[in-house]
């Protein structure tokens, strides 16, 4: 409905899950998946979660896109979330996380140096 009415939609979830009840951290990605089920493309949903959210927060000069001078948290996944958003749900697909300029997860395969 929001899409047909050209309403700007951001992404956000206060519930990150509770492992004690079988809800992993990836529960937050459920919203992304539901937006795809509602008719948005995976790339539209990724844009909502990044660029659109920055605009809604009036912080697009600081966040939302990877550009020189902007703050950046970076997520590198094994898969193509722009084609299948579900790859973001699986922690084993998350290979590299950079937060506030620091690597907080590095599951990249290491290659030997010649």
Residue locations for each model-derived region?
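His/Asp/Glu-enriched, well-ordered alpha-helical/loop segment
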Residues: 1-80
């Amino acid at each position: 409905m929001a899409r047909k009415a050209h309403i700007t939609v951001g992404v956000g979830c206060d519930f990150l899950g509770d492992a004690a009840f079988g809800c992993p951290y990836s529960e937050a990605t459920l919203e992304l998946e539901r937006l795809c089920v509602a008719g948005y493309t995976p790339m539209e949903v990724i844009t909502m979660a990044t660029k659109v959210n920055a605009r809604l927060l009036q912080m697009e000069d600081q966040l939302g896109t990877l550009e020189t001078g902007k703050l950046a948290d970076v997520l590198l996944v094994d898969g193509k979330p722009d084609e299948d958003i579900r790859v973001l749900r699986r922690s084993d697909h998350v290979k590299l996380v950079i937060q506030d300029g620091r690597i907080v997860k590095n599951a990249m395969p290491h290659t030997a140096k010649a």
